[in-house]
Regions:
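Conserved ATP-binding N-box helix of the HATPase_c
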Residues: 51-76
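Short beta-strand element(s) in the Bergerat
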Residues: 25, 85-89, 138
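Glycine-rich phosphate-binding loop
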Residues: 112-126
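Glycine-rich/acidic phosphate-handling loop/turn and adjacent ATP-lid/helix
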Residues: 89-115
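Conserved post-beta-strand hinge residue in the HATPase_c
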Residues: 94, 117, 145-147
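Bergerat-fold GHKL ATPase/HATPase_c domain
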Residues: 1-58
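Glycine-rich nucleotide-binding loop
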Residues: 97, 135-141
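Short beta-strand/loop element within the Bergerat-fold HATPase_c
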Residues: 75-85
C-alpha cells in the first residue's frame, strides 16, 4: 500500500478523474450517517465480484463515518471511477482540515473499540491512498487494484 500527502505525488482528484474520460460517478451527500446507505447501494450494484465490493464498502464506511462524526462538514461528495483492473474512490468534503494519513496513533487489534478500526484498516484494504486539502476541501482518494 502506498500513501501520500498533498502534492508529493501526482494526485487523482475529482477534476483529473473526470477529465481523464473514465467511467465516473458522483454522489452528493448530506453529512449524516443515514447517507451511508446510498453509498452501500451504489457500491453493491457495481459489476464487481462480491469480495471486492465488500472490501471497497468497508473502507468507504470507515472514511464516511469519520467525516460525519468528526469533520463538521456541511456536505460530502463521493466519486467512483473504474478502469480495467482498478477502482478509484474519492471522498471530498468541506469540513475542518484533517489528514488521516498523518495519524501517529496506530492501534493494535486488541485495542480497537466499537468505533471501528480506523485508518489502519483502510490502509490495509487499499492498494494506494492519498490525501490533499485544496481550496478548503479535504480530498481523500483510495485505489483498489487487483492483487
Amino acid at each position: 500500500m502506498k500513501s501520500s500527502i498533498g502534492d508529493k505525488t501526482e494526485q487523482l482528484n475529482e477534476s483529473t478523474m473526470l477529465a481523464a474520460g473514465h467511467h465516473s460517478e458522483c454522489l452528493e451527500l448530506s453529512c449524516e450517517l443515514s447517507e451511508l446507505e446510498r453509498i452501500r447501494e451504489y457500491i453493491f450494484q457495481l459489476p464487481l465480484d462480491s469480495g471486492k465490493k465488500k472490501k471497497i464498502f468497508l473502507a468507504c464506511e470507515e472514511i464516511f463515518a469519520n467525516i460525519v462524526n468528526y469533520s463538521g462538514a456541511d456536505w460530502i461528495q463521493f466519486y467512483y471511477d473504474s478502469r480495467e483492473t482498478e477502482v478509484h474512490v474519492i471522498f471530498s468534503d468541506n469540513g475542518k482540515m484533517f489528514n488521516p494519513l498523518e495519524s501517529k496513533n496506530e492501534k493494535e487489534f486488541e485495542d480497537f473499540d466499537a468505533g471501528g478500526m480506523g485508518i489502519s484498516l483502510v490502509k490495509e484494504l487499499c492498494s494506494d491512498i492519498h490525501y490533499s486539502n485544496t481550496d478548503g476541501k479535504n480530498i481523500l482518494s483510495m485505489e483498489f487494484s487487483e492483487k
